[in-house]
């Protein structure tokens, strides 16, 4: 008999096993049985005159007599031939085409009774099948001839007389699998049938009481029913069980990672009443919100503990995450540790340097004239710095003079040595992976696992928080600091109302005349980038270079413009941002390089060109660059799509709410599940086969509860079955999280 871990070549044959491995990476019985059907089709039928016609793309299986069989030359190469069959007549006529037919044409002749199976198309109202699977049902010598998959099923179900038993094909439903031209659905079905006929009863990885609590069928029943059950209710119960399996596997991988990190020793840093953190609290020119105080206290308690803190801080744009992180870093510095803040771009890293130095004042001027007695240093380390600059920063870090190091990916590759690293802060977590944030933690002293705080201004749906970030505890800032100004958002559908775009340029001029500043955002840098990337129409999208050149002599000819995008050198980007921040530039023409972290309080209006080319979360992030000062702000989303299109409705949804959490839920419903989890260490995408983060919150929460209790409280009798590790296997080595990077 056969178990789930057995290789397929001993069961289905080397040729079929090699094809499954080559096309889908399917190697074992478990791999094959978890290659679930994508849909189901009715069994083989003789179509009647009154039968409803199938829809294009539907998988059909028909039995009928060939009324015409013609071999014709290919148009592009007359030496090559193709076979065209006509079966049935009238509205049920089907034309089947076989290219490079060769030996196929010998058996498929007029008046032969055949079975054809494939995806149906239509041409001039006639049903079409291209290279369908086929089976000759009245072969003169009684041998089964046809596609290997159908032939194998026919051979296995043949009567003593040699006649094909049609009952094998007349089931109410057949599974339709994700397939390819090389490996069709019938091929996969034949292998599945062959495996299930010899498969031993499958041991259940979940305890009986858990299955009973959630009304789940057994693993063995589910794996068989998902492929062979003819009843939809049986298939539904199988899907529920296999969905729960996937939720448990994912949560077990996450709880294993989480507790693996917690087993390390963390740098304990109790708060000091005479330290930098307490002094900054006394000097702050504003009051923290209630939410900020709560998160500060949670972080303070975590930093004082002897196990490493692992926490995600999410909050709306402008909710004040940075000051909370600064207070946490000062608590670590008070205890003799250093901190590193990892930012995704040099623009954001430079912004953090300015804002943190500004909020610290003399407390951040260590070894400088005018610095406080116990002041620390704040330093920047990026890839564009000169070797001499990097050498000076490295020396101050190694000596311990620098308490807060701010940098980009350069921190990961740089030969930097810390005097005593105690905390890693990662800003905009979705731009980094697990392996990158952990790479910094390895720069601490042996035996110490630095505390970890990761931050994002992109709100995260609860189901994503429980999965993608399931190895982290979570804090949320929803309350905006007092004084944040409202942002009005409007969509400009340019095709319908071209005059509104003219008015948008006029509004920018009005804001500039009032002494304020503006952003104009384009989806591309220049014409070398794919004009259709993310688009829904044939019109090439705007470019930052093109807009900048046009606006200088056109709509914004009389204002001071600057250009900002990712291909500029670090010095050019710094110069543009410094000039814009200083008020020397009126309008910044840019790409989404300003999506995160850029803080210019005097900027009050933003025009996003071809807004449909941006994701929901990107638009919400971009909009957060305005409304940061004392004046009400306006965000205009210009698009050439129609209002009723999916892209148009998405833009309207963004314009109608400033609730980033509501937009995050909408974003999750629209994206493919495969974008959520990222890739494993071999680079293969981690995809969800059954589990939907948008639809299965109940399953995800139940799985998290079970896995957490089973891991943390084995004395309660929740010790997991051995099969849990198998469910978690494809998630356990996930080393790169990409959920929000694709938003």
UniProtKB/Swiss-Prot annotation:
Residues 520-694 form the Helicase C-terminal domain. Its EC number is 5.6.2.4. Keywords: ATP-binding, DNA damage, DNA recombination, DNA repair, DNA-binding, Helicase, Hydrolase, Isomerase, Nucleotide-binding. GO terms for molecular function: ATP binding; ATP hydrolysis activity; DNA binding; DNA helicase activity. ATP binds at residues 315-322. It comes from the Bacteria. It catalyses: Couples ATP hydrolysis with the unwinding of duplex DNA by translocating in the 3'-5' direction; ATP + H2O = ADP + phosphate + H(+). One of its GO terms (biological process) is DNA repair. A motif (DEAH box) lies at residues 427-430. Residues 524-545 are annotated as: Disordered. The keyword Transcription does not apply. The keyword Cell cycle does not apply. Residues 44-171 are annotated as: Wedge domain. Residues 302-477 form the Helicase ATP-binding domain. Plays a critical role in recombination and DNA repair. Helps process Holliday junction intermediates to mature products by catalyzing branch migration. Has replication fork regression activity, unwinds stalled or blocked replication forks to make a HJ that can be resolved. Has a DNA unwinding activity characteristic of a DNA helicase with 3'-5' polarity. Monomer. Belongs to the helicase family. RecG subfamily. The wedge domain within the N-terminus inserts into the replication fork junction, where the lagging and leading strand split. This is ATP-dependent DNA helicase RecG.
């Amino acid at each position: 008999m056969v178990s789930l871990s057995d290789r397929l070549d001993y069961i289905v044959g080397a040729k079929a096993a090699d094809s499954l491995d080559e096309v889908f990476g399917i190697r074992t019985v478990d791999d094959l049985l978890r290659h679930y059907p994508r849909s189901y089709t009715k069994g083989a039928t003789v179509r009647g005159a009154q039968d409803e016609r199938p829809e294009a793309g539907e998988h059909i299986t028909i039995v009928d007599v060939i009324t015409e069989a013609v071999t014709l030359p290919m148009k592009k190469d007359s030496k090559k031939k193709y076979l065209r069959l006509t079966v049935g007549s009238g509205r049920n006529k089907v034309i089947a085409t076989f290219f490079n037919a060769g030996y196929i044409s010998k058996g498929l002749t007029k008046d032969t009774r055949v079975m054809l199976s494939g995806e149906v198309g239509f041409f001039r109202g006639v049903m079409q099948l291209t290279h369908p699977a086929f089976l000759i049902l009245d072969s003169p010598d009684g041998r089964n001839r046809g596609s290997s998959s159908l032939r194998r099923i026919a051979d296995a179900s043949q009567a003593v007389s040699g006649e094909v038993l049609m009952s094998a094909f007349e089931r109410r439903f057949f599974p339709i699998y994700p397939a390819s031209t090389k490996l069709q659905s019938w091929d996969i079905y034949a292998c599945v049938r062959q495996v299930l006929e010899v498969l031993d009863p499958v041991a259940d990885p979940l305890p009986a009481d858990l299955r009973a609590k959630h009304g789940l069928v057994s693993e063995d029943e589910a794996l068989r029913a998902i492929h062979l059950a003819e009843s939809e209710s049986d298939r539904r119960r199988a899907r529920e069980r296999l969905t729960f399996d996937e939720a448990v596997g994912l949560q077990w991988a996450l709880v294993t990672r989480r507790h693996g990190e917690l087993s390390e020793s963390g740098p304990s840093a109790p708060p000091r009443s005479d330290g930098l953190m307490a002094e900054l609290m006394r000097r702050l020119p504003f009051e923290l919100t209630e939410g900020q105080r709560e998160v500060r206290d949670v972080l303070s308690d975590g930093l004082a503990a002897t196990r490493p803190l692992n926490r995600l801080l999410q909050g709306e744009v402008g909710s004040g995450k940075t000051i909370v992180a600064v207070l946490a870093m000062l608590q670590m510095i008070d205890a003799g540790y250093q901190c590193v803040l990892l930012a995704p771009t040099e623009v954001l890293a430079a912004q953090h340097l300015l804002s943190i130095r500004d909020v610290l004042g003399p407390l951040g001027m260590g070894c400088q004239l005018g610095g406080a007695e116990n002041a620390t240093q704040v330093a920047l380390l990026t890839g564009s710095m000169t070797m001499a600059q990097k050498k000076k920063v490295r020396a101050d870090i190694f000596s311990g003079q620098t308490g807060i190091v701010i940098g980009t990916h350069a921190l990961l590759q740089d030969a930097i040595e810390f005097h005593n690293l105690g905390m890693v802060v990662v800003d905009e977590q979705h731009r980094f992976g697990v392996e990158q944030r952990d790479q910094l933690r390895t720069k601490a002293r042996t035996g110490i696992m630095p505390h970890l705080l990761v931050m994002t201004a992109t709100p995260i749906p609860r189901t994503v928080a429980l999965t993608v970030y399931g190895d982290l505890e979570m804090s949320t800032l929803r309350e905006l600091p007092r004084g944040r100004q409202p942002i009005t958002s409007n969509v400009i559908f340019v095709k319908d109302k071209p005059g509104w775009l003219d008015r948008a340029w006029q509004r920018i001029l009005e804001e500039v005349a009032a002494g304020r500043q503006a952003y104009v955002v384009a989806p591309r840098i220049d014409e070398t980038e794919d004009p259709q990337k993310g688009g829904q129409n044939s019109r090439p999208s705007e470019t930052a270079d093109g807009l900048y050149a046009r606006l200088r002599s056109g709509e914004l000819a009389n204002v001071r413009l600057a250009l900002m995008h990712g291909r500029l050198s670090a010095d050019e980007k710094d110069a543009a941002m410094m000039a814009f921040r200083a008020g020397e530039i009126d309008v910044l023409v840019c790409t989404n390089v300003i999506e995160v972290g850029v803080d210019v309080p005097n900027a009050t209006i933003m025009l996003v060109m071809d807004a449909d080319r941006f994701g929901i979360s990107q638009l919400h992030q971009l909009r957060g660059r305005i409304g940061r000062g004392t004046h009400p702000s306006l965000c205009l989303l210009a698009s050439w799509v129609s209002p009723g299109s999916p892209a148009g409705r998405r833009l309207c949804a963004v314009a109608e709410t400033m609730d980033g959490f509501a937009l995050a839920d909408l974003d999750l419903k629209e994206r493919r599940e495969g974008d959520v989890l990222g890739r494993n260490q071999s680079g293969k995408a981690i995809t969800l086969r059954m589990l939907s983060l948008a639809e299965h919150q109940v399953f995800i929460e139940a799985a998290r509860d079970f896995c957490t209790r089973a891991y943390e409280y084995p004395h309660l009798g929740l010790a997991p079955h051995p099969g849990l590790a198998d469910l978690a296997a494809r998630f356990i080595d996930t080393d790169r999280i990409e959920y929000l990077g694709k938003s």
